[in-house]
């Protein structure tokens, strides 16, 4: 043991704490020079934290029908330990030189501010809510699977800081005695504002948007109720829109696409956004040098649903068709994969719902 007292301080040695950590000497060296921070872990391998989070709100009734409010709130996700903590990257070149899987992904914290309005207008026929918000995230936790460069196991790390800001609006309108309209819309702007040094050239650059955060999404619904044959009948229809977004915080899409081509002889067919710069240190098979720092694009999607129903006494029945146009609406899931995999919306689905109340 090159570091006297380490075995005693950490209850039998670093090897017992960092299973799968590779070279014991390398792990000890990383602890000594500060690349692996174990200050939050006690001799039993337990991480404990104490803190206070705040939530405060203030509202003001402008009239009987309109209220405005403000909210300040804080949140957090607790720290998490990595089972392959202390493992040096298998690739010790370029941006990976000296990289070590962290012992702990630190607690990430959130500060949120909201200003909004809740209202009932048009003699109670219209309910309208609007809220604007801004959120700051410090030490954002992310998971990563990078077997080509770091380790075969998924691990957690703190990528840096981020900001989000947006506006949400929802409404319900009694357009007539029979017709009800409802809907919601959300505008979202996100940005990665700081990147930890060890992730430069691995994560997407500062200024990039956060993954799976479409700038615009919304829905609108209509329902028409009427009496028929001694019971209650209705028609309903809905449209749901989800704007385009990107997947993942690591800029590994071009690298994964190259792996896809070598493994299966074909591309995934999913669009890629170049975020600027290059990713990693392994050149692509096309002979064009390092792959670009890039992410997969999840295209926007619009789905439509319709239904017709009837209820009488204790029985109700509804015939429905969801996703009429069989919109694919795929979302790429890059985490924990060598090649891109996608989840998709359920295709056009028709069915009959029956219920009985007693």
Task: Locate predicted features.
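Signature of Gram-negative outer-membrane beta-barrel scaffolds
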Residues: 1-63, 100
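Short sequence motifs at beta-strands and strand-loop junctions characteristic
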Residues: 44-52, 106-109, 159-165, 210-216, ...
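Residue-level signature of outer-membrane beta-barrel architecture
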Residues: 50, 58-61, 74, 107, ...
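Hydrophobic, lipid-facing positions within transmembrane beta-strands of outer-membrane proteins
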Residues: 52-58, 101, 111-115, 165-169, ...
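Membrane-embedded beta-barrel scaffold of Gram-negative outer-membrane proteins
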Residues: 61-77, 83-85, 95, 104-167, ...
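Transmembrane beta-strands of outer-membrane beta-barrel pores
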Residues: 72-78, 87, 121, 132-138, ...
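Gram-negative outer-membrane beta-barrel transporters
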Residues: 127, 132-136, 155-251, 353-357
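C-terminal beta-signal and adjacent terminal beta-strands/loops
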Residues: 239-265, 279-280, 309-358
């Amino acid at each position: 043991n090159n570091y006297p007292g380490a075995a005693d301080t950490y209850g039998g040695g670093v090897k017992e704490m960092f299973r799968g950590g590779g070279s014991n000497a390398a792990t000890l060296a990383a602890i000594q020079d500060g690349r692996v921070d174990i200050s939050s872990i006690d001799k039993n391998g337990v991480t404990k934290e104490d803190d206070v989070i705040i939530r405060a709100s203030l509202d003001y009734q402008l009239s009987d029908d309109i209220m405005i409010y403000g909210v300040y709130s804080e949140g957090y996700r607790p720290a998490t330990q990595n089972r392959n903590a202390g493992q040096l990257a298998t690739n010790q070149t370029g941006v990976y030189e000296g990289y070590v899987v962290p012992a702990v992904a630190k607690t990430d914290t959130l500060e949120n501010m909201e200003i909004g309005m809740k209202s009932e207008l048009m003699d109670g026929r219209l309910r309208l809510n609007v809220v604007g918000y801004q959120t700051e995230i410090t030490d954002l936790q992310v998971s990563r699977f990078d077997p080509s460069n770091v380790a075969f196991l998924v691990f957690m790390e703190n990528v840096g800081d981020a900001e989000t800001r947006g506006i949400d609006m929802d409404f319900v309108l009694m357009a007539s005695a029979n017709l009800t309209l409802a809907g919601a819309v959300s505008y979202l702007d996100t940005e990665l504002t700081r990147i930890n040094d060890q992730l430069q050239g691995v994560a997407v650059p500062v200024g990039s948007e956060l993954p799976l955060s479409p700038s615009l999404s919304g829905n609108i619904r209509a329902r028409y109720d009427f009496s028929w044959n001694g019971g209650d009948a209705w028609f309903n229809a809905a449209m749901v829109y989800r704007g385009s977004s990107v997947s993942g915080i690591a800029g590994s899409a071009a690298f994964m696409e190259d792996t896809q081509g070598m493994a299966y002889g074909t591309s995934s067919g999913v669009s890629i956004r170049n975020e600027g710069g290059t990713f990693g240190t392994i050149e692509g098979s096309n002979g064009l040098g390092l792959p670009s720092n890039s992410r997969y694009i999840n295209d926007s999607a619009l789905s439509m649903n319709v239904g017709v129903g009837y209820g009488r006494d204790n029985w109700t029945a509804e015939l429905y068709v969801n996703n009429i146009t069989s919109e694919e609406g795929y979302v790429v899931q890059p985490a924990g994969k060598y090649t891109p995999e996608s989840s998709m919306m359920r295709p056009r689905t028709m069915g009959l719902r029956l219920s009985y109340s007693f």
